[in-house]
């Protein structure tokens, strides 16, 4: 299992808390490096002050980690990583899965739902209606 390092951000108040699910099923950790100490919004509500250098924050859901990543991008912090941690201590790296964020171009990444035509070249749904083909297959 990979050992995660970093200090927990400083917050005055509730972090929304980890659910008991975190001890039974899984929890998530997000790590990032900050050039300076600055206040940011927590996805669970409230605000916290991130430390200069490495930061580590545990969250109950993956979506909270993705949301926090969006917050960090406003601070020009793009080196964040999200991990899934199982109750037995096993850690898996989950985002960005292949090391490149989904919105960036990556050589060799398969195109999903790609249709090689302009929108004006789409077939008319009226012509396809009883042909047995779907508009997304034509």
UniProtKB/Swiss-Prot annotation:
Keywords: Photosynthesis, Photosystem I. It holds the Pfam family PsaD. One of its GO terms (cellular component) is photosystem I reaction center. The keyword Cell cycle does not apply. One of its GO terms (biological process) is photosynthesis. InterPro entries: PsaD, PsaD_sf. Belongs to the PsaD family. PsaD can form complexes with ferredoxin and ferredoxin-oxidoreductase in photosystem I (PS I) reaction center. This is Photosystem I reaction center subunit II. It comes from Nostoc sp. (strain PCC 8009). The gene is psaD.
């Amino acid at each position: 299992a990979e050992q995660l390092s970093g200090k927990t951000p400083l917050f005055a108040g509730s972090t929304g808390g980890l659910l008991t699910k975190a001890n039974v099923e899984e929890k998530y950790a997000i790590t990032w490096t900050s050039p300076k100490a600055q206040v940011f919004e927590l996805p669970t509500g409230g605000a916290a002050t991130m430390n200069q250098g490495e930061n580590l924050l545990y969250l109950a859901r993956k979506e909270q980690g993705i949301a926090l990543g969006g917050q960090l991008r406003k601070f020009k912090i793009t080196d964040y990583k999200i991990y899934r941690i199982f109750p037995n201590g096993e850690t898996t790296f989950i985002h960005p899965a292949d090391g490149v964020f989904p919105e960036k171009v990556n050589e060799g990444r398969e195109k999903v739902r790609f249709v090689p035509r302009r929108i004006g070249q789409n077939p008319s749904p009226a012509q396809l209606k009883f042909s047995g083909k779907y508009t997304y297959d034509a």
